[in-house]
Regions:
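Intrinsically disordered, low-complexity, compositionally biased regions/tails
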Residues: 6, 23, 33, 55-56
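Generic low-polarity alpha-helical segments
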Residues: 3, 26-29, 65, 69
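Negatively charged, low-complexity tracts enriched in Asp/Glu with abundant Ser/Thr
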Residues: 2-26
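A short, charged, amphipathic alpha-helix used as a generic interaction element across diverse proteins
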Residues: 19, 43, 50-52, 57-73
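Short aromatic-glycine-(Arg/Gly/Cys) micro-motifs in beta-strand/loop hairpins
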Residues: 31-52
Length: 73
């Protein structure tokens, strides 16, 4: 099994992610956003990095993405 290459950093979240956006901030200040594409009904987790946003994963439900956020427990 090969590893998937990391997603490229995008300057902004694509306009196709046109549904509600929920921002999560960890104790260390790392910012994540969960977005929704209203056409496909898919939710996507994005991580804020210097220079833009990195797409981490897409899922049918936003609840499937929350476990990927490191809340600095």
């Amino acid at each position: 099994m090969g590893r998937r290459p990391k997603e490229a950093i995008q300057k902004s979240i694509p306009s196709s992610e046109n549904g509600p956006r929920v921002t999560h901030e960890t104790a260390s200040g790392q910012i994540y956003k969960v977005t929704e594409n209203l056409k496909t009904k898919k939710h996507t987790l994005w991580k804020n990095l210097d220079g833009g946003w990195q797409k981490l994963k897409s899922a049918d439900s936003p609840y499937d993405l929350y476990e990927l956020i490191d809340y600095d427990n």
